[in-house]
Amino acid sequence: MMELLSPAGGFDSLIAAVQTGADAVYMGFGAFNARRSAKNFTDEEFASAVSYCHLRGVRVFLTLNTLLTDRELVQAADALKKACAMGVDAILVQDWGLLTLAREIVPDVPLHASTQMSLFTLGGANEAAALGMERVVLARELNRDEVREICAGCPAEIEIFIHGALCMCYSGQCEMSAVVGERSGNRGACAQPCRLPYGVDGPCRGGHPLSLKDANLSAYLGEMAEMGVDCLKLEGRMKRPEYVAVITGIYRRLLDEKRRPTAEESRRLEQAFSRSGFTDGYWLGKKGPQMFGTRPENAPEPKELFAEARAQYENGRENRRIPVSLAIRVQAGKPVSLAVACQSNNGLMNVWAQGPVPETARSRALTAEELRERLSKTGGTVFTVEQFRAELDDGLMLPASVINGLRRDALEGLKQRLEQDWFLRRMSPWQKEELRQGRDPHVRRVLEAAALPEAPEPPKTMRFTCSVLKAQQVTAALLAEKPAIVYVPIEELERLDAGLDWGETELCAVLPRIFRTADEPVLRQLLERHPEATAVAVGNLGHLPIVRGLGRTLRGDFGLNIFNSRALLFWREQGLSSATASFELRWQQVRDLNKHLPCEAIVYGRLPLMVMENCVTRCNVGCTHGAGSVLTDRTGAQFPVTCGYGCRCEIQNSRTLFLADKPEMHRCGLTYGRLRFTTETPEQCAAVLRRYKDGGDWTPDDMTRGLFYRGVE
């Protein structure tokens, strides 16, 4: 049976999810999760939530799926230890540094690769599995055949989103909220700029070309089960508890009854929340304008539907009762005893409670039926009496308070035993031994014991590199300025001028950030066809199997989202020779990185904001055959839309990052500073490099300092 995974943005939502049929819930506590604006949980609430779920057989997954700075990793280590101590069943991660930290501090807690890791190929999923990921959450953009292929070939469990909001950009690759509004989607603070109006190749007139409808894949659960999907994820940690109850309840029934939704159930899903209806476009491989939709700000609340939903979980309603057997012995001259038993993960579990010696009845004697009636009053608990047996001598009496007290004590004891049983079940042998020895069973190594090795001294001077969008931007004039590296998209290599003199400049082939399993052999063949590209830019975990064994120098691209020193160390261990730091970091944070790898930063150019599966150009003005378009926002700012590998388009920033006049750029311990050319002419490319190297007078018309000084939330 596939697992149904529901969102829990707060305790009310958690109760709603559990009581309407979730097999597992995902939730966050603290600041380090991809929905920081959700209510989330305090430490105490989280511990109570774990107990609440485990008692009812529901698993709890902690979301620590954001990018973290070096300082934040110290706090994250504490969160890891607390989560393990509370009995969390798995942890979702995005950050490469947190991945290595979790393996050292809580090595036996299962890790799940968040969709923020941007995994969408069989090769990438297998790399994640090789790193110890028990589960991989796939990108929402995959179609049914691509999911089927990954399920068939990956040893890790596969989780997919089946209902809820769709981002326009691939998860983990969106920088629009960060660059435009200083609120990072990679750090759980997305401001959702994709829901705002824009114009395409014209002024903004109120259209919403970046706003996708919510996904609804309720009609395809049967084929998901057949292809081997392990977990079905419902999106919605920012949504109300009533919404969680509605969608969880409907999907629970569909799974249990192995059927498609009725017209009424489909209507209820849409009534709970939608944006002009739903879409199944990605799953079916049918992209296009029909996938886009909006939701009015004053959309009415479905009061009747939500009232019905609340009735399913409010006021202590318990839909997931545990059947128990009760056996009471009331004998003359002996203390009364009550045994309660239920099935647990380790077989039958028994708990005993003992009371006083019964008295001789002065008038009416105690009956077995009276005992059954009082002991069966389990309201307010998770238990329900399924079997009852009484051994009762004649002529005895017990006060009602004693009977009720026996019931409370026995059921409370059973509750505690069940919670402990769940925790011990997922404890590893070494943890059980630590517990037996009276030591902390939750943490094998403290943070200090897992200190980073000393990094080499960074270089005193920074060399400049260039990346281009098109081959014609690489000219003799550019190479005459002797850039250390020139990054060229792999599909543009064959268009380079064969007569160029590269001198000591390294030619680095850039693999596409977004690709598919079917592209893996194609990309490898392109690399083999171009041995002159002695280096390869790696921007995704799925690139590693493509480049492995080719003997090329590997350089980490910005798509890896390197945010801390541990991430640099991780990628060094994967064979990289240099790596690009996230451009969300302030210059002080870049400076303070322990440079376990030669480090690069983008210091010029239009920063990439979104990379998309749905072409914003084709959906709005028709295909321009690679020429792209221009996106205009409400303020008149214009964002170029460029076209790349596989006809996937990318939104570039409206303003050009320019730091040539900022000396801090040279004080960060960087080995390389990258000049990122997108819309520049070949002449401008050479002029910009001269400006950065020799202090020329070239400046862009509309410039920004990026996040180098501002940083992000």
Indicate residue ranges for each PLM-predicted region:
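Long, basic N-terminal domains or extensions that often function
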Residues: 134
